[in-house]
C-alpha cells in the first residue's frame, strides 16, 4: 500500500540528496565533476531526454488503453507514476513524475511502504556524453558494471537500505514495485539531485536506473 504524505516537495528535495549519497556510494555533494567539456549543455540535454521518454510513454499508454481498456497494463510495458511526495489531487507537470519501462514482473504481491527496508539490484546510467557514447555507469550494486553481473542470481550483490533513504524518484519507484520486478526507471533531475553535483554525477542529471526489487521487510 502506498503511504500518504504531505511533506513539501521543496523540503524533500533538500533532504533526499543527503540521504541517498551514502547508500549509493557517490561522493560528497561538495565535490565538483570538474569536466565541463564532457557534459556540454547538460541540463538541456537531460531535460530533453526526459521529455522524450515521457512522450514515448504517454503515446504507448494511450494506444494500449484505446485497444485494451482496463487491461491495458497487460499489453504495455510503460508506466508513469506521480511522486509520492505530491498530493495527486494537485495539478502537476511532467517533472513531478517518473517514467518506467517494465523489463520483468515478479509474482503478484505487496509493495514496500515508506518505512520498510529493501534489497535492490541496480545500475545507474547517465545520458550519453563525449567520452561515454552509451552513457556512463555512475553506480551499480554488483561486482561489475554490467547487467550480466548485477542481475545474475549467482553474482548479484543487492544493496539494502530504507525505502525512505533514497532520492524522491527512486523512492517513488520502490513504492510501486513488487519483489521480482525489474524496471528501467527514468527520474527527472527535479526528483533526483537537481543542481547538486558529485565526482560521478553532474548537476541536472536525469537518472536512468535499471533496478530490481529483491525483497523488502
Go through each PLM region and give its residues.
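C-terminal motif of bacterial Sec signal peptides marking the signal peptidase cleavage site
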Residues: 24-28
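Sec-dependent signal peptide recognition
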Residues: 13-18
Amino acid at each position: 500500500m502506498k503511504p500518504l504524505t504531505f511533506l513539501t516537495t521543496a523540503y524533500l528535495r533538500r533532504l533526499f540528496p543527503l540521504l541517498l549519497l551514502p547508500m549509493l556510494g557517490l561522493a560528497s555533494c561538495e565535490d565538483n565533476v570538474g569536466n565541463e567539456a564532457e557534459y556540454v549543455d547538460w541540463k538541456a540535454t537531460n531535460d530533453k531526454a526526459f521529455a522524450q521518454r515521457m512522450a514515448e510513454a504517454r503515446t504507448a499508454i494511450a494506444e494500449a488503453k484505446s485497444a485494451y481498456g482496463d487491461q491495458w497494463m497487460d499489453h504495455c510495458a510503460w508506466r508513469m507514476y506521480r511522486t509520492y511526495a505530491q498530493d495527486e489531487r494537485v495539478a502537476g507537470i511532467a517533472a513531478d513524475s517518473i517514467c518506467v519501462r517494465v523489463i520483468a514482473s515478479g509474482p503478484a504481491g505487496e509493495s514496500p511502504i515508506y518505512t520498510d527496508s529493501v534489497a535492490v539490484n541496480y545500475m545507474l546510467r547517465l545520458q550519453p556524453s563525449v567520452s561515454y557514447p552509451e552513457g556512463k555507469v555512475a553506480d551499480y550494486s554488483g561486482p561489475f558494471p554490467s547487467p550480466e553481473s548485477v542481475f545474475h542470481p549467482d553474482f548479484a550483490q543487492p544493496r539494502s537500505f530504507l525505502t525512505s533513504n533514497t532520492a524522491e524518484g527512486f523512492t517513488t519507484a520502490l513504492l510501486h514495485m513488487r519483489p521480482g520486478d525489474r524496471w528501467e526507471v527514468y527520474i527527472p533531475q527535479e526528483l533526483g539531485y537537481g543542481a547538486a553535483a558529485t565526482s560521478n554525477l553532474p548537476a541536472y542529471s536525469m537518472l536512468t536506473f535499471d533496478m530490481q526489487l529483491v525483497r523488502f521487510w
